[in-house]
């Protein structure tokens, strides 16, 4: 039975836990090869996972933000790269469906494609010259208006999930104006190509290669939105990012607990889990995990239960969740490695992969310095 046919969040979470079990077994191979986990995505598509955040009126399930991050965490425990990748699709799909960000006809066609065949989408915004889109740089990718539509030229970096994407949402400066637009480009468009540039030591299986657009021709209605560089409304869907890194931390914690409760060197009686120094680290991991869960889950539920006006005041809060959970997750993985010791650095040990992958969270948006600045501004305004 597909996830989309199950009635409750609990049923879907339990079913997904079973679906992703093979992901854990495949993760080391994909990481070592730096190859894309097509098998994982085929399993997710077969389960109907890409359609969970499609609104009900288009044939999806329209799950809550809280349920979405629980699912993302579950996938990340099995494989962080797969979780981060699919998280962009389910998050953006949810956001567009809730905000009516595109014309009805355009979103309906996309949503139907997701429901019928598991079509996948991601934003393509980052460029080498402009850096992170969150800092407001104007894209060098250019869209030129022609009689029957648009011609787009440019290159986007860090296009996560690009080996399997069906749709790209590309930011481009509109030629002859000061405007920036968001354009929907299908993979089958002429002028669309991929250059395999992804050589990161973290999240190696995300396939975050370059998207190259060479005289890509689009219909006029594929300009789906106008953007204001640097202006980012509150986006609850971005909580898929901290959910992913918390999942990686939980995988590391589970490994460390298993090791501590089964490893019994000849120098002691019992296992190392009974040694006070190890118990301190186990306790600290659990404390940090609980703090992450409560912060992440409570803010997600607040988003689900509040009005759009209140949601737009939550930007500092959402950013704080990302900063806190990612940094706490890094500490959890570090503690796990201290418990396991030097063997955690073995190429065969999953902890070394968790260590590399969890640090990638520092470079996902929003950046820590911008979050702290926004929190400072918030505290000053509230003091007045």
Where do the PLM segments sit?
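Glycine-rich beta->alpha junctions and the first turn(s) of the following alpha-helix
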Residues: 200-289
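C-terminal helix-coil-helix/basic helical segment that borders enzyme active sites and/or dimer interfaces
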Residues: 24, 28-31, 290-324, 337-340, ...
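Basic/polar N-terminal segments that are highly enriched at the extreme N-terminus
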Residues: 1-14, 18, 384
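A short core secondary-structure module
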Residues: 155-192
